[in-house]
Each structure stands twice: as C-alpha cells, then as structure tokens.
C-alpha cells in the first residue's frame, strides 16, 4: 500500500513537470511564429504613411488577432498549470503527513511489542507513546531492548551458577544415601536398648558410614545385659508373634507399641512378667446400643414334686419372664405346688404339697395360664440312683408306722356315705368310737 502511494506521488510530480515544459514550449513556439515573417522595416520616405497603410492591412490585423489569442491561451495554460501544481503540492503534503503518522504508529506498536517480550517497565513504554518521530522511537527501542537483554543474561548466568554450585557429583550422592540409611538403622538399633538422645546425636552427626558403624559398636558394647521379650498380636488383620532385645520391660513395651502402631494394630495390652510376653488384643468394633439385644440372665428352677424331682435352667431378661417360663414347664410336667424365689441365686423352687382328705375324690390341679410362648428349658436333672435308693429306704421306713396308723384309722373309720364333710355324721362316728374304746378298756381291766 505504501509503495503504491509513492508511485502515484511520483507520477503526479512527473505530470506537473511535463505540463510546465509543454506550456513553455507552446509560448516559445507562438512567439517564434509571430516574429519570423516580420523583418526590419526599411526606412523609406513617407514611411509613416506606408506604415500606417501596412498596419491597417488585413494581413496585419489577422496576424495581430492570432497573436492576441495565442497570448490568452498561453496565459490560461500557465494559470492552469500553476493551479494544478499547487493542488498537487497540497495533496502530496497531506499524503506525506498521513504516511508519516502511519509509520509513527507502526513504530510505536513494534516497540511496545518488543518491550512486553522482555518485561520492560511502564516508564519506558510511556516514553515510546510520547515520541514524535520514528527515528526517536527506534533509537529508544534499541537502547532499552539492549539493556533488557543484558539483564536477562545476567540473571540466567547467576541462576545457572547457583544451580551448578548446588549440584554434587554422582559418587557423593551415593555416599550420602548410604550414610543416611546407616544412620536410620543405627537409631533403630539404639531404640531397642533405650539409648539416650546423647548417643543418637553422635550417630546423626557422623560424617561417614564407617564412623556410624564404629559408634554403634562402641555404644552397644557399653550397654547393660538385655533380655528377650515377646509380643503376641491378636489383631483383626494381623496375627502372630515377634521378639526384641531390651534392657527392661518398659523399653520393650515402647518398641512393641511402635511396631503395633506401624502395622495398624490398636487394642488392649497385657504383660506376663514370668514369660516376658506382651499381648495386644485388638478392640472389637463399637456397635450402637440400640442394635444390641437385651442382656439375659440365667435363672434356675428346683422341682420338688411327687413324681418329678430335679433342676432346670432358662435364660431370660428378667425374673418375671423366667417365672412364666418355669410355671409353664411345671404345668406341662404335671407339677403343681408352692412357689418361692431367691433373688440372690436367681433360683425358683416349686414344692408339691401332699394333702389327702378322707372321702374326697382326687381332683386335677388347676393349670396356670399360658399367656406367653414357651421358652426352651434345660431338662430337669434326674436324681442319682444312690440318692433314689436312700430316698426309697427312708420312704419304706416312714411308711411302716404310717401303715399302722392307716390301719388303725381304717378300723376306726366308718364306711363312707358320700358326705364326708357332714358334721352330724362326724359327731356320731366319734361317739361310737369313744364308746368302743371305753368298752375295750373296761373289759381289759376286768381281765386284770
């Protein structure tokens, strides 16, 4: 675009020059054409008259008119040429001003772009924006960019120098790693024996692996005698045993707890001094109390029945529930009697009563209400054979006098009429019995 503007500008300049040359050539040609046929007027007599005659001739008049017209044309051509030149000059000046403004703006944009690349401060950017010429912009740009490049090189050099200073040879790096590992192992060994921090600091300040080994040997040689302690792990995910050497139980416990912690075992600790054994049992997971079933207690039932004797147990949440279960059990086994309960031993006792009323028909015992489901019970414990024999012997001994009494009663008792509870019959029977007794006594006295 800029090149095209320059070409147009030079074409206009060339046209202006060509127009000026053409006008000058035209004026020169006209003057030559007018002057060429006229020669010097010879001096003759009566020249005034002759001149007057020639001046008024048609040829002379025509020539004069042509000369006047040519002069007018020349003047007009010159005026047009001058006006065109002035206009061209004004346009060229305006174009040059616009081109200069464009060049100035482009130079500023290029300079600011380069300043941003090097991180130049706003102070220098303002100087560029206030510059009036392209040459001034380029000069300032060159100076600022050169300074920025030098600053960058200096920073990079300093950074590289620091980096190189921080680097160590590969051999030194390997030695440093070996030294660090030796220190870690040495400190672990010292922890087993409960060595003080003073000796650990000596290890940490050692400069070579050999120095660490010498220190650890000296320290261990000076330590008191150690014992072997054992750890039993009862964890959810880790179970097993391990041992360690330590000067006392406290030191061993510290080592074992660290070991358990490293392996994610957290539980209750116990120690047996006789076997020098620690045991850690991991705690069970905590369960929400609302999810737990009620606690149950074991209750016992002692049965003293006519046909069933023994004991049984059941588990229940309270004594009332156990009592219902026991009564249902007794009822199912035909046991009905007097119930007692001992809270201290959680024991129920049912004793079946032996009641015989003469003349009364045996009646079935009333069954208690079974309002709850049966609770499984432990079957009643049978009575041992030896105990049973003893009981049978006692029963036989007890039955002998009872049999005599029963015989006496049978002899004295009248036949039943179905009204065993009639008071009148009872009184009559007693009177008869008394009379019979009196007669027997009297007859006996007479015999004596």
Swiss-Prot record:
Sequence repeats lie at residues 104-140, 179-215, 228-282, 298-352. Residues 386-410 are annotated as: 5 X 5 AA repeats of [DE]-D-A-K-K. It comes from the Bacteria. The gene is spg. The modification Pentaglycyl murein peptidoglycan amidated threonine is found at residue 417. It is a peptidoglycan-anchor. Residues 384-412 have a biased composition (Basic and acidic residues). InterPro entries: GA-like, Ig/albumin-bd_sf, IgG-bd_B, LPXTG_anchor, M_anchor, YSIRK_signal_dom. A motif (LPXTG sorting signal) lies at residues 414-418. It comes from Streptococcus sp. group G. This is Immunoglobulin G-binding protein G. One of its GO terms (molecular function) is IgG binding.
């Amino acid at each position: 675009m800029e090149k095209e503007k320059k070409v147009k500008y030079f074409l206009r300049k060339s046209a202006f020059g060509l127009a000026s040359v053409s006008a000058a050539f035209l004026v020169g040609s006209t003057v030559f054409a007018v002057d060429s046929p006229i020669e010097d007027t010879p001096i003759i007599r009566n020249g005034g008259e002759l001149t007057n005659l020639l001046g008024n001739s048609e040829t002379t008049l025509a020539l004069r008119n042509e000369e006047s017209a040519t002069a007018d044309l020349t003047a007009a051509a010159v005026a047009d040429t001058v006006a065109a030149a002035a206009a061209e000059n004004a346009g060229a000046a305006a174009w040059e001003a616009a081109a200069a403004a464009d060049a100035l703006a482009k130079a500023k944009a290029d300079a600011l772009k380069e300043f941003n690349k090097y991180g130049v401060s706003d102070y220098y950017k303002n100087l560029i924006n206030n510059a009036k010429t392209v040459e001034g912009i380029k000069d300032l740009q060159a100076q600022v960019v050169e300074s920025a490049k030098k600053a960058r090189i200096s920073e990079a050099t300093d950074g590289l120098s620091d980096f190189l200073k921080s680097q160590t040879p590969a051999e030194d790096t390997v030695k440093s790693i070996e030294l660090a590992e030796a220190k870690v192992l040495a400190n672990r060994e010292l922890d087993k024996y409960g060595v003080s921090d003073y000796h650990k600091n000596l290890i940490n300040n050692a400069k070579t692996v050999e120095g660490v080994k010498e220190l650890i040997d000296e320290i261990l040689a000076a330590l008191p005698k150690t014992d072997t302690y054992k750890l039993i792990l009862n964890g959810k995910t880790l179970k097993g045993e391990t041992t360690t050497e330590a000067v006392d139980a406290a030191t061993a416990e510290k080592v074992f707890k660290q070991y358990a912690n490293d392996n994610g075992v957290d539980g209750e600790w116990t120690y047996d001094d006789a076997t020098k054994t620690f045991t850690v049992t991991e705690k069970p997971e905590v369960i929400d109390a609302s999810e737990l079933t009620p606690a149950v207690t074991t209750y016992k039932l002692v049965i003293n029945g006519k046909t069933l004797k023994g004991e049984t147990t059941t588990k229940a949440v309270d004594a009332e529930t156990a009592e219902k279960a026991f009564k249902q059990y007794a009822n199912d086994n035909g046991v009905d009697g007097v119930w007692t309960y001992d809270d201290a031993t959680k024991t129920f006792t049912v004793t079946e009563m032996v009641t015989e009323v003469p003349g009364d028909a045996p009646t079935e015992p009333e069954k208690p209400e079974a309002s709850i489901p049966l609770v499984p019970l432990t079957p009643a414990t049978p009575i041992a054979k030896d105990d049973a024999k003893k009981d049978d012997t006692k029963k036989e001994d007890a039955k002998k006098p009872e049999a005599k009494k029963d015989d006496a009663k049978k002899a004295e008792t009248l036949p039943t009429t179905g009204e065993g509870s009639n008071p009148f019959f009872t009184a009559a029977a007693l009177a008869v019995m008394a009379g019979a007794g009196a007669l027997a006594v009297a007859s006996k006295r007479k015999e004596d």
